[in-house]
Amino acid sequence: MYQDLIRSELKEAAETLNNFLSDDANIQSIQNAAVLLANAFKAGGKVISCGNGGSHCDAMHFAEELTGRYRENRPGYPAIAISDPSHLSCVSNDFGYDFVFSRYVESLGREGDVLLGISTSGNSGNIIKAIAAAKAKGMKVITLTGKDGGKMAGSADVEIRVPHFGYADRIQEIHIKAIHILIQLIEKEMADQ
């Protein structure tokens, strides 16, 4: 009944992954991001992650697997996803939704920390403001974007961009794969210290 649709969806997902994989710059960006994060942890820094909608879920997923565990038992790493409902509703109400992430970064970010901003379009105003706040604090910035990178293109120390121009779910599928690889590489870097 739906087998052709299922095959088509899985085929498109595989093609998106293969296109991403075929560009060595994408592989290098993931490696650079992992090393940047591990070096921040080694120096006593933390990562603050943020995103909207499904990307918000990815930001939380990233943080929980760093503070909790991924595949192996090991010490937790300092990671915070900006997801506190009281913070989000307060700042949205009092300042506007564009400031929900930047206010948090202004409050808790410091030099030596890393911001991970996730936006499939690269055009999320609140992530753009968070990037500016992070830079003002002397933080490093990693972005996970899609399409042409949008307004966030070129704004990060490391950008992992999925150059897919279709629906956002394909971009999100690569983002979560990149997140899992980042954690795997961070664990390796931290174990090798």
UniProtKB/Swiss-Prot annotation:
<feature type="binding site">
    <location>
        <position position="61"/>
    </location>
    <ligand>
        <name>Zn(2+)</name>
    </ligand>
</feature>
<comment type="subunit">
    <text>Homotetramer.</text>
</comment>
<feature type="binding site">
    <location>
        <begin position="52"/>
        <end position="54"/>
    </location>
    <ligand>
        <name>substrate</name>
    </ligand>
</feature>
<dbReference type="GO" id="GO:0008968">
    <property type="term" value="F:D-sedoheptulose 7-phosphate isomerase activity"/>
</dbReference>
<dbReference type="InterPro" id="IPR050099">
    <property type="entry name" value="SIS_GmhA/DiaA_subfam"/>
</dbReference>
<feature type="binding site">
    <location>
        <begin position="119"/>
        <end position="121"/>
    </location>
    <ligand>
        <name>substrate</name>
    </ligand>
</feature>
<dbReference type="InterPro" id="IPR046348">
    <property type="entry name" value="SIS_dom_sf"/>
</dbReference>
<keyword id="KW-0963">Cytoplasm</keyword>
<dbReference type="GO" id="GO:0005737">
    <property type="term" value="C:cytoplasm"/>
</dbReference>
<feature type="domain" description="SIS">
    <location>
        <begin position="37"/>
        <end position="193"/>
    </location>
</feature>
<comment type="function">
    <text>Catalyzes the isomerization of sedoheptulose 7-phosphate in D-glycero-D-manno-heptose 7-phosphate.</text>
</comment>
<dbReference type="Pfam" id="PF13580">
    <property type="entry name" value="SIS_2"/>
</dbReference>
<keyword id="KW-0119">Carbohydrate metabolism</keyword>
<dbReference type="InterPro" id="IPR004515">
    <property type="entry name" value="Phosphoheptose_Isoase"/>
</dbReference>
<keyword id="KW-0862">Zinc</keyword>
<feature type="binding site">
    <location>
        <position position="172"/>
    </location>
    <ligand>
        <name>substrate</name>
    </ligand>
</feature>
<keyword id="KW-0479">Metal-binding</keyword>
<dbReference type="GO" id="GO:0008270">
    <property type="term" value="F:zinc ion binding"/>
</dbReference>
<dbReference type="GO" id="GO:0005975">
    <property type="term" value="P:carbohydrate metabolic process"/>
</dbReference>
<comment type="similarity">
    <text>Belongs to the SIS family. GmhA subfamily.</text>
</comment>
<feature type="binding site">
    <location>
        <position position="65"/>
    </location>
    <ligand>
        <name>Zn(2+)</name>
    </ligand>
</feature>
<feature type="binding site">
    <location>
        <position position="65"/>
    </location>
    <ligand>
        <name>substrate</name>
    </ligand>
</feature>
<feature type="binding site">
    <location>
        <position position="124"/>
    </location>
    <ligand>
        <name>substrate</name>
    </ligand>
</feature>
<feature type="binding site">
    <location>
        <position position="180"/>
    </location>
    <ligand>
        <name>Zn(2+)</name>
    </ligand>
</feature>
<protein>
    <recommendedName>
        <fullName>Phosphoheptose isomerase</fullName>
        <ecNumber>5.3.1.28</ecNumber>
    </recommendedName>
</protein>
<dbReference type="InterPro" id="IPR001347">
    <property type="entry name" value="SIS_dom"/>
</dbReference>
<feature type="binding site">
    <location>
        <position position="172"/>
    </location>
    <ligand>
        <name>Zn(2+)</name>
    </ligand>
</feature>
<comment type="pathway">
    <text>Carbohydrate biosynthesis; D-glycero-D-manno-heptose 7-phosphate biosynthesis; D-glycero-alpha-D-manno-heptose 7-phosphate and D-glycero-beta-D-manno-heptose 7-phosphate from sedoheptulose 7-phosphate: step 1/1.</text>
</comment>
<dbReference type="GO" id="GO:2001061">
    <property type="term" value="P:D-glycero-D-manno-heptose 7-phosphate biosynthetic process"/>
</dbReference>
<dbReference type="GO" id="GO:0097367">
    <property type="term" value="F:carbohydrate derivative binding"/>
</dbReference>
<feature type="binding site">
    <location>
        <begin position="93"/>
        <end position="94"/>
    </location>
    <ligand>
        <name>substrate</name>
    </ligand>
</feature>
<dbReference type="InterPro" id="IPR035461">
    <property type="entry name" value="GmhA/DiaA"/>
</dbReference>
<keyword id="KW-0413">Isomerase</keyword>
